[in-house]
Design a protein with these regions (language model features):
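A short acidic (Asp/Glu
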Residues: 110-112, 184-191, 211-214
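Electropositive, glycine- and tryptophan-enriched low-complexity nucleic-acid-binding patches
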Residues: 124-167
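Acidic, metal-coordinating catalytic cores used for nucleic-acid/nucleotide bond scission
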Residues: 153, 177-186, 206-209, 340-341
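Short, surface-exposed basic-aromatic patches at helix termini and helix-loop junctions that form
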Residues: 167, 188-198
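Basic, amphipathic alpha-helical segments enriched in Lys/Arg and hydrophobic/aromatic residues
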Residues: 337-360
């Protein structure tokens, strides 16, 4: 965090020692707990971190409603995200000059206050909220986000989010990644009419006005031709591209069949619904063999089916970075969740995500996974002496190899006061020459 400038950024926003120490504790916990269910107070109490956050009562880190509420203020979000973009631009002037928008539904196990009743993609009506994220196209790092009710973005909501990102942190959106149910006549027309959007890719819904089933018939017998097959993540896909006009606009339609999924689910249906299956016509049986793996992407990018699918799925992976599981969110009493605490939790996770991605990038090429780094590194023990010196135990061979690969030198001891000064936890006592 110190090497990437994140520590200095946080210090510039959180000027009080206790506030700064508190945000460090929460971010370190979010990043380094590595999927475990350990609470923040337990995590800090068992680590070196407890030595450098002395102003924070450990028991207050368990639910910490005030922290998330304070972090959820709009001014805090703008200060942190704007400062982050400026920090990145100091080393890369093009950072944020081209971004794409992705989104993911949030679980409602904690009754998110702004959730709205909807049935989009759920198989029934339920309360949902959605998180839209703007990411820098070159680095994939998040630069802005918005939380809204329901599970479908209409055009006005989407434009508000885009304008908000441009106004608040000065990033420009030129690419849109849209998931199931997003492609509408209104959106297709707007994307083509607005020259800010260099590209867009979205999934075609199976409803009236769209050639969803027509494209299946258009493919005909080619769905069995090997020249249209390609492999991705252990699955074999049929993929074919068509150039066409949709709502008066020239677009590219990419027709896919996940052959493995279609075969598996088709077999399951036949085995469990034998009488119904036998009653189907030959055409209906043929459709049943592919329908569970069939989907269509709509884009204004002329590419190959394999490249388009990789681009679409690759940019849909953003939800994996956000820790919105029931286990973590339920640490706060349900009665304490408000719009501000939800926003604060998301901002905490956004900053943590940036830190996580930067660590992962630094490890690329070393052969180290994040889990291996945090798992092995956490076994290294230390003790603090009365004079403030921290004695670090002799690391075993495996731990030494981990730290060496990560480019980190293991000290035999360190001066706690000097460490706190170097990490901006305390002001320096003397001017540096």
């Amino acid at each position: 965090m110190e090497k990437t400038g994140i520590t200095a950024l946080l210090r510039s926003v959180f000027t009080k020692d206790e506030d700064f120490q508190r945000v460090l504790a929460h971010i370190c916990h979010t990043v380094a707990k590595d999927g475990s269910h350990i609470s923040c107070d337990d995590f800090v109490s068992r680590s070196f971190l407890s030595y450098v956050v002395p102003d924070v009562p450990l028991q207050s880190l368990y639910s910490d409603t005030k922290y998330f509420s304070d972090l959820g203020r709009d001014s805090m979000k703008v200060s942190l995200m704007k400062g982050y973009v400026e920090m990145e631009r100091s080393g890369n002037k093009d950072f944020g000059s081209g971004c794409y928008v992705d989104s993911t539904p949030l679980p409602n196990d904690i009754d998110i206050p702004i959730s709205a009743l909807c049935s989009h993609g759920t198989g029934g009506c339920e309360m949902q909220a959605r998180l839209a994220v703007c990411l820098d196209s070159a680095s994939g790092l998040p630069v802005w986000y918005s939380l809204f009710s329901g599970n479908i973005q209409d055009m006005s909501t989407l434009m508000d989010e885009i304008d908000d990102a441009e106004t608040s942190v000065g990033v420009s959106i030129d690419d849109l990644v849209l998931d199931a149910g997003y492609i509408t006549k209104e959106l297709i027309t707007a994307y083509n009419a607005d020259d800010r959007f260099v590209s867009f890719t979205g999934r075609m819904p199976a409803r009236k006005g769209f050639p969803f089933r027509t494209l299946y018939h258009r493919c005909g017998g080619s769905i069995h031709q090997a020249k249209y097959f390609f492999d991705r993540n252990g699955h074999t896909y049929f993929g074919r591209r068509f150039e066409d006009v949709l709502f008066g606009k020239r677009v590219y339609l990419y027709v896919y069949i996940d052959r493995d999924r279609a075969l598996s689910l088709g077999r399951s249906y036949r085995q469990n619904n034998r009488d119904e299956y036998e009653a189907l016509s030959d055409k209906e049986k043929n459709w049943l063999e592919v329908k569970n793996g069939y989907f269509v992407l709509v884009s204004n990018i002329d590419s190959t089916p394999a490249e388009t699918l990789e681009r679409y799925f690759g940019r849909m992976d953003i939800e994996s970075f956000f820790k919105t599981s029931k286990e973590y969110l339920s640490l706060l009493p349900l009665s304490k969740w408000t719009r501000e605490t939800i926003e604060g939790k998301l901002l905490n996770d956004m900053i943590s995500t940036i830190v996580y991605l930067k660590i992962r990038k630094a490890l690329s090429g070393t052969g180290l996974s994040m889990s291996k780094l945090f798992g092995r590194a956490s076994s290294l023990m230390c003790t603090r002496k009365k004079d403030g010196t921290v004695i670090v135990e002799e690391a075993n061979r495996q731990v030494k190899e981990i730290f060496k690969a990560a480019g980190i030198k293991i000290p035999s001891s360190l001066d706690l006061e000097e460490f706190e000064e170097s990490c901006l936890l305390k002001p320096r006592k003397k001017n540096m020459k």
